[in-house]
Design a protein with these regions (language model features):
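Long, contiguous binding/interaction regions
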Residues: 1-77
């Protein structure tokens, strides 16, 4: 397993329900989740995970395919 942080920018709030479904699906790998609202529309969310790299990549890819949501993962060495 690897430790990773996935940074998520949500620009389309109507997609948050789909995002939450994905986070629930991968919940057993999520160590911590935190976020803030810098503007009225955009959300910034960070997810810390302890999971196999393929699992982290899969979640990051699924999140990134949601309309108006961007995601990038940063891994421990």
């Amino acid at each position: 397993n690897r430790i990773a942080v996935i940074g998520i920018i949500v620009e389309e709030p109507q997609e948050v329900e789909k995002l939450n479904q994905l986070l629930h699906e991968y919940g057993s790998y999520i160590i911590e989740e935190w976020g803030f609202l810098p503007g009225e529309k955009d959300h910034v969310i960070s997810i810390a995970m302890d999971a196999p790299q393929d699992t982290i990549n899969a979640l990051t890819g699924k999140i990134g395919r949601l309309e108006g949501i961007s995601a990038k993962a940063v891994y421990s060495k």
